[in-house]
């Protein structure tokens, strides 16, 4: 018999195995969720799926570390789009700033044309 997925403020609670993978307890996960006001830590939206992913720093060999050590690499909770595309493990803050400058320059050019 499969259990119904549990939710907290409309957000799906990760499985115990998922929490264990990141060295977290459900209470720690809920603390992060509460600190983020029950939304994605990046776009500040409630995902339509109700699912927030555990975003973590991508460090070589982190899965072999103790639970306590793995927990230190958790950055927050993010929706699928932000976790997959904005926080991709190859993306760094300077790259995001460059992307923002690129888009802002495009918007400025468009505004001049109008």
Question: Across the structure, where does each feature detected by a protein language model lie?
Answer:
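Positively charged, low-complexity intrinsically disordered regions
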Residues: 7-10, 57-59, 110-111
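Short, charged surface segments at domain edges that flank catalytic/cofactor-binding sites
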Residues: 7-39
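Terminal non-globular linear segments
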Residues: 30-55, 101, 108-114
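Histidine-centered nuclease catalytic patch
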Residues: 39-81, 86
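A detector for short metal-coordination/catalytic motifs
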Residues: 86, 90-114
